[in-house]
Amino acid sequence: MTKLIFMGTPDFSATVLKGLLTDDRYEILAVVTQPDRAVGRKKVIQETPVKQAAKEAGLSIYQPEKLSGSPEMEELMKLGADGIVTAAFGQFLPSKLLDSMDFAVNVHASLLPRHRGGAPIHYALIQGDEEAGVTIMEMVKEMDAGDMISRRSIPITDEDNVGTLFEKLALVGRDLLLDTLPAYIAGDIKPEPQDTSQVTFSPNIKPEEEKLDWNKTNRQLFNQIRGMNPWPVAHTFLKGDRFKIYEALPVEGQGNPGEILSIGKKELIVATAEGALSLKQVQPAGKPKMDIASFLNGVGRTLTVGERFGD
């Protein structure tokens, strides 16, 4: 039985962890995840999905604010683990820790070398990729730069957003890891170096990147909106107030970018630099998320054709 330390944080990671727990070839000695955080307006302390899964399985849990140089790292190195599996952990692993293991692999939610970084699923959508995927790679000190052990792809559809793709890729990552790990541990797989000429980066989304620029095409804005749904959520401004857009569809239309072209009982069409967007799910300032019909029947009922979204 191979003894593992698992490191991860969000639901994606929890799915991978639960997969490992179903396989009796592995023993999880410890789980490392990010500390509990205060979430929302009420600052409710929330455990990570990985911590919740680990508690359900009765596993030892470590939550260092920073792994490097921590007492927790020293404890982990004394457990006698054969290797480390990480999946969206959110911290760099110190070389000292990596060097103490027989192996360390990462489950990364992109088709490396494309989309290294913390937001690969977001960027796959924002940049209009036709496919997404998961790469199992060896851990090195440089971010997502290790040799690739295996990859698996799935198509991206127009119905996908961050939430749906997150769920799909979590299952892909779980299955790919379970399919790959035995042969890798046995030495039957020769990892492949990444082509550095093809590297792209997908860093965490910055607040200023959430803002919609109506001078882009309808397809670009469509991709940005779904590439931020359900988080962090793209926004624009309407009458000076922040206006979030969760869902929209590209449609035909022509007008000044940001201009309202037509209003119906269940339809609000806004011009872009090329074509237009039909808004489907929105959140006006100070209001809950709602479908476009509810918006137009409520706070949006005073809107008129020709008004503008934007600054």
From Swiss-Prot:
GO terms for molecular function: methionyl-tRNA formyltransferase activity. It is an enzyme of class 2 (transferase). (6S)-5,6,7,8-tetrahydrofolate binds at S110, L111, L112, P113. It catalyses: L-methionyl-tRNA(fMet) + (6R)-10-formyltetrahydrofolate = N-formyl-L-methionyl-tRNA(fMet) + (6S)-5,6,7,8-tetrahydrofolate + H(+). It holds the Pfam family Formyl_trans_C. The keyword Transferase applies. One of its GO terms (cellular component) is cytosol. It comes from the Bacteria. Keywords: Protein biosynthesis, Transferase. The keyword Transferase applies. Its EC number is 2.1.2.9. Attaches a formyl group to the free amino group of methionyl-tRNA(fMet). The formyl group appears to play a dual role in the initiator identity of N-formylmethionyl-tRNA by promoting its recognition by IF2 and preventing the misappropriation of this tRNA by the elongation apparatus. Belongs to the Fmt family. NCBIfam families: fmt. This is Methionyl-tRNA formyltransferase.
